[in-house]
């Protein structure tokens, strides 16, 4: 049987995965052709009671990569009307990703986790842009799982009957300012808070630790 205190660790809670909340703002829906314009990551930590909390935040405005497509409707949606404005303080994809990955690896190691995993709202979208940008930058040591994610749209649909981020947050008893929405920084912070709320409420309801949790079912080396 797994020791109760050991079960109340980030490593054991997510089978060796280190969850990192991500949100991106983009100039379209195609990760291969459309520009990545903003990215934010929030790491998570678990306290001695096994409750999950947001930890570190890292955020960048990003320069469109050379030849990137910029959909007018997407720019109007995000409010990033001029992606090339020097007032944005944007950095290259390469710089943004390397800094994020440096933080993720440091905190993943401190948590004794084997691999990072992306948490996002409609996670396939954010995951696809992160992976496409990593490939463009020829980054070989990407800390995130190549396809697995935790999707808060799915989880909040199960927990609260809502899949839209703003509605899910409000149903969960959280504040959500629609005027701040579609900023990667704000949306990541709210997604992190939502994910922590879902995980912590499930624990409070008795869903974790598992009653019959043996080591054969918790192989941290098997991360597929």
Swiss-Prot record:
Binding of Mg(2+) 1, residues: 23
Residue sites binding Mg(2+) 2 per the record: 23, 25, 182, 187
Coiled-coil stretches noted in the UniProt entry, renumbered to this chain: none
InterPro entries recorded: Exonuclease_RNaseT/DNA_pol3, RNase_T, RNaseH-like_sf, RNaseH_sf
Keyword Zinc-finger found: no
Entry annotation: catalytic residues: 182 (proton donor/acceptor)
GO cellular component terms listed in the entry, alphabetical order: cytosol
Sites marked Important for substrate binding and specificity: 29, 77, 125, 147
Keywords: Exonuclease, Hydrolase, Magnesium, Metal-binding, Nuclease, tRNA processing
Boundaries of every Exonuclease domain copy: 20-195
GO biological process, one term: DNA replication proofreading
Cofactor: record remark: Binds two Mg(2+) per subunit. The active form of the enzyme binds two Mg(2+) ions in its active site. The first Mg(2+) forms only one salt bridge with the protein.
Cofactor(s) the record lists: Mg(2+)
Classification via SUPFAM superfamilies: Ribonuclease H-like
Enzyme Commission number(s): 3.1.13.-
GO molecular function, one term: nucleic acid binding
Top EC class for this record: hydrolase
UniProt key word Secreted: no
HAMAP family: RNase_T
UniProt function note: Trims short 3' overhangs of a variety of RNA species, leaving a one or two nucleotide 3' overhang. Responsible for the end-turnover of tRNA: specifically removes the terminal AMP residue from uncharged tRNA (tRNA-C-C-A). Also appears to be involved in tRNA biosynthesis.
Family per similarity comment: Belongs to the RNase T family.
Self-association state and partner proteins as the record states: Homodimer.
Protein name: Ribonuclease T
Underlying gene: rnt
